[in-house]
Amino acid sequence: MGSSILTNRSAMTALQTLRNIDNNLDKSKDRISTGLRIGSASDNTAYWSISSMMKHDSNTMSAVVDAINLGREQVNVAATAVNLTKESLDDIQKSMVSAREKSDDDIMKIQDSIKGNMQNISNAIQSAAFGGKNILSNGGEKVGIAAGYRREGSAVYVDMIEVGGAELNFGVMGPDGTIDMTQGILKGVFGKSDKDIDAGIKTFTEAADKQKGLEDALAKAEAAVAANPNDEAAKTALEEAKKAVEDNKEDWTKAQSDFKVVADSMTLNDFVQMQGVGGLPSVAQSIILNSVQKTVRHAVDVTLTAGSKIGSAVNQVDSQLNFVKRLLDNIEAGIGALVDADMNAESAKLSALQVQQQLGIPRLFLLQIRAARIF
C-alpha cells in the first residue's frame, strides 16, 4: 500500500495497539491493586451478580454469627447460675443432715447457714442476665437464639434455637427488677406453706406430750410390777396404763398423720424462719426434718434436670456456631473463586504488558519519522 499524505495507516495501527496495551495494563494494575478480576458488572455480568448475592449472604451470615455468639454467652451465663445453684443445694443438704439431734442453738446456726446458701441461689439466678435476657427468670417462656440464615428462592429465613421452658423456670421477673423465686421450680425452697404451721406444731406438741406422759406412766407401772410381781395394786395400775396407751393409739396415729401433712407443706424458707426447733419433741423434729429434707432433695432433682437441659442447649449452640462459621468460610471461598484475581498470573501479565508498552512507543515514533520523510 502506498503512502498517503493524509493518513498514516501504520502509525494508526501502532497507536491502536498501544492504546489496547495501555487499557489492558490499566486493568491488570487495577486487578493487582484490588485483588479482584471481577470488580464491577462490566467485567462479567453473571459472575458479578452471583458474587454480589453471595456477598450479601456472607454479610448476613456474619451478623448471624455475632447473634449466635451473644446467645451462646446468654446460655453459658445461665449454665453457670444453675451450677452454682446445685452447689448451694448440696451444701443445704449437708446442713439438713447435720441438724438431727442438735440443740436449739446449733439448729439456729444451721438455719443461718441455709439462709446464706438460699441468698447465694437467689443472687446467682438474679445475675444470670446477659444482653438484656435472663433465660432462668422468664416465667417458663422460651428465649429464641439466632441459629442460621438461609435463602430459598426469593424467600429468606433466619432459623432460631429455643432455650428455656418449664424445666428452666426458676422464677418470674417482677416490675421492680427482682425475681420472684416462689413461682419457679424452687418454690419448695423459697415459697411459703399454705398451712398454719404454728397451730399445727402446737396441736401436735400437745398430743406428743400426752403420748409421752402415757408411755412414761406405762414404763413406771412395768417397773413397779417387775420390782414386786405379787403386788396386785401394781398389776392393776399396769393394766390401766396399758389400756390408756391403747385407747390413745388412734388419736396419736391421727395426730402424727395430721402433723405430717403440715410438715410436708413446709418449704425450706418456712424451716429457716422457725424458732425453737431444737426445743420441740424429738418426734416433731424428726417429722419436720424428714419433710424438709425431701423438699431439698426434690429441689436438687429439678436443678439437675435444669442443668441437663441447659447443658444440651450449650452443646447445641456451640455446634450451630461451628457449623455457621464453616458455612461462612465456604461462602467466602466461593466468592473468591468467582471474583478473585490470580496474583501470580496478573503479575506476569503486567510485566509482559509493560514490555509491550516500552516497545510500542519507540515503534510509533519510528513510523512517525518515516512518514515525515515523504516531505
Curated annotation (Swiss-Prot):
It comes from the Bacteria. It is found in: Secreted; Bacterial flagellum. InterPro entries: Flagellin (IPR001492), Flagellin_C (IPR046358), Flagellin_N (IPR001029). Keywords: Bacterial flagellum, Secreted. The keyword Secreted applies. The keyword Secreted applies. Pfam families: Flagellin_C, Flagellin_N. Belongs to the bacterial flagellin family. This is Flagellin. It comes from Bartonella bacilliformis.
